[in-house]
Amino acid sequence: MDETSIESCFVEFPTRDWRDSDAAGAVRLAVVGLGRFARNRALPAIADSSLCEVTTLVSGSPEKAKRLATEYDADHVVTYEGFRDGRVTEAYDAVYVATPNAYHAQYTEVAAAQGKHVLCEKPLATSVAEAEEMVAACEDAGVTLMTAYRLQTEPAVRRVRELVVEGVIGDPRHVSGWFAYRNPDQSPSADNWRRDSSVAGGGAMIDLGVYPLNTARFILGADPVGAYATTVVDTSGAAGDHDRVEARATFQLAFPDGVDATGFASFDTYSDNRLQVLGSEGRALIVSPFGGTVTQEVVVERGEARTSYAGSPVDEVVEEFEYFAYCVLTGTEPEPDGRDGVADLRAVEAIYESAERGERVEV
């Protein structure tokens, strides 16, 4: 593509290019874990999806679960023990695991043993070893395991990946991205498990940093081979009696063929997020790609030419559930599968090791 044709980059590109056939029916979901994200984002997204419906809620709080069951017309409410015992397995086809990170493996493996497909929140687990066990359990059971990454279904991000592959910005040289989100709960409350390293597996890096990390891998179509990182530990006292986690993480990733990426994640700075791909001939900038409900703002430049695009707002969480259900109903292998989650955790572990040792670590 030359500079004169760059304006055609966003002409009539499909918003759901992953959907190449019709999907009949709806996937009945059991939602395991009813924390803030499940209540505020996931359950409303499932309600807005044309291919999903929630039939079962799993929680340690019966009162909360019953209230939400009434709100979202869920037929069954069970405890975690009841879910493990398989009390209402006939009521759902797939399981959405939205528990704190340390419990992802446990409930994914329970679901696989029940023969249910799994959409598991990111990060897939708190360690590579656990994540690999989850992948093996689902493969042995013959069920789908999708890591709940939203960016693979966001139309503008998918289009930017196509433009990079098509060489619109030349050869990709560098990806930079950041995700800063000030945690609204700065107190050491029970619901603030993200500040407990034994439950979260880390802090800002494993919670927010996986977004620019995973999106860089997605756009480049490659895995990092080396990592260098620094972290700043939370000293605010918000962690309470928990082990302190990093409030900020800055990392650099080396990819094959001399390509690299830099990323930043933060719990304690002004909330903002960006992703930029620099190539030998131009660049692509995505404004606010990680926010959940996004404006699809993209700027593409090549030489002296420049074009911009702003689509209709997209709820990435709705797109994520729609995509997962489509994959289950059509037998399609999801692109952010379990092994994708393992690859990110392998990089995250290298990032943490590098920050601790103060030197580059091979991934």
Question: Which residue ranges define each predicted feature?
Answer:
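Predominantly a Rossmann-like dinucleotide-binding segment in NAD(P)-dependent oxidoreductases
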Residues: L151-A238, G358
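Beta-strand-loop-alpha-helix segment that lines the small-molecule cofactor/substrate pocket
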Residues: A94, P100-N101, A105-R150
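C-terminal helix-rich "cap/oligomerization" subdomain common to oxidoreductases
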Residues: M1-D22, V58, E63, A69-D75, ...
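Glycine-rich Rossmann-fold phosphate-binding loop(s) that bind the pyrophosphate
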Residues: L34-G35
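NAD(P)-dinucleotide binding in Rossmann-like oxidoreductases
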Residues: G240-E246, A254-E319
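A short, Lys/Arg-enriched amphipathic alpha-helix followed by its capping loop at the start of a domain
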Residues: P44-C52
